[in-house]
């Protein structure tokens, strides 16, 4: 599994990064097979490091909601200002967008 990281800093809900990492990077088949286990693993590590145990169903809802943000972040790299250089190969961006939108359809995000 690889991850495209833009090296930017922002403040937001933990599920934003998790949704991006899982939906943009994994093939749809792998995501379908692993996403719940990956989220459980993330929540276990979160609890171990913070002492806060998060509810899985609520966390899964947050994960689904943040797929929209993942789509936005990928779309920006495809439709950036002409004043900026290409951020990544168009093929990479289109693959990530296809994966994210497939996840959104699978999980009825919209």
Question: Where does each model-flagged region fall?
Answer:
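Short, charged, surface-exposed loops that flank catalytic or proteolytic processing sites
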Residues: 52, 56
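Pre-DFG segment of protein kinase catalytic domains
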Residues: 2-5
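Glycine-centered secondary-structure boundary/capping sites
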Residues: 50-51, 108
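Regulatory N- and C-terminal appendages and interdomain linkers associated
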Residues: 57-110
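Active-site activation/catalytic loop segments of kinase-like enzymes and analogous catalytic loops
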Residues: 8-50, 67-88
């Amino acid at each position: 599994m690889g991850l495209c990281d833009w090296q930017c800093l922002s403040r937001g809900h933990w599920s934003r990064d998790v949704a991006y990492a899982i939906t943009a990077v994994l093939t749809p088949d792998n995501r379908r097979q692993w996403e719940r286990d990956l989220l459980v693993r993330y929540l276990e590590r979160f609890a171990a490091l913070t002492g806060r145990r998060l509810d899985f169903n609520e966390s899964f809802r947050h994960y689904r909601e943040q797929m929209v943000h993942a789509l936005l972040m990928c779309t920006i790299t495809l439709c950036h200002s002409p004043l900026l250089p290409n951020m990544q190969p168009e093929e990479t961006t289109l693959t990530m967008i296809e994966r994210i939108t497939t996840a959104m359809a699978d999980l009825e995000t919209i």
